[in-house]
């Protein structure tokens, strides 16, 4: 059985003339899932492997490169990229973003379907953000503790080095004094 690795991202994207949106993504080797919210309403985009393959082929890209570019632009707002969440009818939205490639501005977009339970979807996005924040805070605390321990050890090494240097000077002074006698 093939080991399927998934990665997650969640970003706050600024859309022109509108409130920011949040995009939580789950990235698989051959496709992705998006959950998008404006804080009130939520939408989902779950293209199949075949849909992603077709979209990548339209842009003459291997699926892996298509997914990497999508993750780059949806995982963190990129300077110069224009993001939009436009009406697609029946409560659905179209998420789009621009990017530069070989001097050309390209526009990628995916239709996002209205979530059957926006409250639940919003809670899932907030849970993900809170979990990520807690993990990041824990990591910062651990790294600060490690830094403090290393600082104490470095101070001990410096003290020991100074002591050894002083003992060496005393020893050399004694040897030279005996040699002069």
Model-based region annotation:
Residues 112-181:
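Intrinsically disordered, low-complexity acidic regions
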Residues 1-137:
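Assembly/interface modules of non-enzymatic eukaryotic complex subunits
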């Amino acid at each position: 059985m093939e080991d399927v690795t998934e990665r997650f991202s969640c970003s706050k994207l600024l859309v022109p003339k509108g409130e920011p949106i949040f995009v939580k993504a789950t990235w698989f080797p051959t496709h992705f899932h998006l959950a998008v919210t404006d804080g009130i309403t939520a939408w989902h985009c779950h293209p199949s492997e075949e849909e992603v393959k077709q979209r990548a082929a339209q842009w003459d890209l291997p699926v892996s490169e298509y997914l990497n570019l999508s993750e780059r632009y949806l995982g963190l707002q990129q300077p110069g990229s224009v993001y939009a969440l436009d009406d697609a009818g029946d409560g659905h939205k179209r998420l789009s973003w621009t990017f530069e490639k070989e001097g050309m501005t390209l526009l990628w977009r995916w239709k996002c379907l209205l979530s059957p339970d926006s409250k639940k979807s919003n809670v899932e996005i907030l849970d993900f953000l809170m979990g990520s924040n807690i993990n990041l805070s824990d990591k910062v605390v651990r790294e600060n503790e490690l830094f403090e321990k290393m600082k104490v050890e470095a101070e001990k090494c410096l003290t020991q080095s100074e002591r050894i240097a002083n003992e060496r000077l005393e020893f050399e002074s004694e040897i030279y004094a005996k040699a002069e006698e």
